[in-house]
Amino acid sequence: MTETVTTTSSDKSEKKNYLFYTSPNHRPPTVVRAEGVYLYLEDGTRIMDATGGAAVACLGHGNKEVIDAMHKQSEKVCYIHSMGFSNEPADKLANLLVSEHPDVFARAYFANSGSEAVETCLKLILQYWQLVGEKQRCHIIARKQGYHGNTLFALSVGGMKPRKQPYEGVFSHTTSHVSPCFEYRYKENGETTEEYVARLAKELEDEILRVGPEKVAAFVAETVSGACTGCATPVPGYFKAMRKVCDKYGVIFYLDEVMSGIGRTGTMHAWEQEGVTPDIQSIAKCLGGGYQPISGALVGHRIMNVFEQKDAAMAGFFTYQAHPIACSAALAVQTILRRDHLVERAAEMGKYLSEKLHETFDSHPNVGNIRGRGLFWGLEIVKDKATKECFPPEYKVGSLANKIGCEHGVFVYPGMGTIDGTRGDHVLLAPPYIITREQIDELVEALSKTITSTVAALP
């Protein structure tokens, strides 16, 4: 929003924007309307939202059924404090999510962002160990190049170095990191998939033994990696091996599906394709589809049984947790996903997107790798395809691709730190599940122009 202000140092009036933008010295374009898979700017420019924002808008923009559900709820109850009351949309949403996997989950807890969902899961894990009399179990093992959110605890378990750097001095010292499952970058030449999995499993076990099994609370991983490694998918057997190591030492197995969950990879939960189940899981983005800020923790029986036996509440609340309007929006989104078979559609359209990406970019000299599942895809941009050499980090290739993409009519999610948290670049695609084949053709054509123009613009 702009307004005319009068400064104290001058009688002259000037227009000033007071919003703290992503870059304080650059005002991004303003979206004045959004419909389906498209965004419309002030000047009438139409841009395809090829990432659903930040892998959020699974239903696309402007779904009237969701908007009507929010309006209807706003006429009943807009806000109550969940410390003292419940509300109908929250109860219905929890019942829907948990009842689909009653053998896996016991309860659902709703917060406001992916970061809050991760914080909630981590806090519940630590409180669980206190309740069972093992309060020394407070060490979290995560993965390098993981990204779990922007709050301090979530950042401390993550591996995106540029976002962590300003706060290094206050991070928890009870976190450590093992290698991610990142076949393109870290599977060795001549190494079989089974050998690669065994090596990663041994690394996790060695880290548990180094810390001390009696001190390790949980292992946390993104089922399909998101912002940092750009949709790096696990190789077959990886998560089964990780789960086996965790079970051996009694370590909580926590899967973060803030970005990859709720249908994004072609199944409701990404872990359904891995043959494992989590002890606890975080969800967010496609839970509410961007219509309201909402996230959740799906709590398994191992943890919930102890809370029930001890009659223990979670040690802390969020003011807006289980917000009635947010839950009504999410309930509408989840109802539509199931009724209209949109998760299955994400799998179907994902196959077509995969075909088009490989057809277009397999021979591109600056696309080193194409990876993903469902409607969740990453393209790693490299300087040399044969050697996998990346561009220097200071080139900010992902950000440049994002900017140039908008000039070609497509918004792509920029990625950096792909290789080690600092080096490496990718762009991420996560279009709405309602995208059509014709729109996928449009997306890939614009992306081809974007990547070619981006590389041409580099020093």
From Swiss-Prot:
Keyword annotations: Aminotransferase, Cytoplasm, Pyridoxal phosphate, Transferase
Main localisation: cytoplasm
One GO term describing the cellular component: cytosol
Subcellular location: Cytoplasm
Modification type N6-(pyridoxal phosphate)lysine: residues: 285
GO MF annotation terms: pyridoxal phosphate binding; transaminase activity
SUPFAM superfamilies: PLP-dependent transferases
Enzyme Commission (EC) number: 2.6.-.-
Top-level taxon: Eukaryota
Family: Belongs to the class-III pyridoxal-phosphate-dependent aminotransferase family.
Name listed for the protein in its UniProt record: Uncharacterized aminotransferase C1771.03c
Lineage, broadest ranks: Eukaryota, Fungi, Dikarya, Ascomycota, Taphrinomycotina
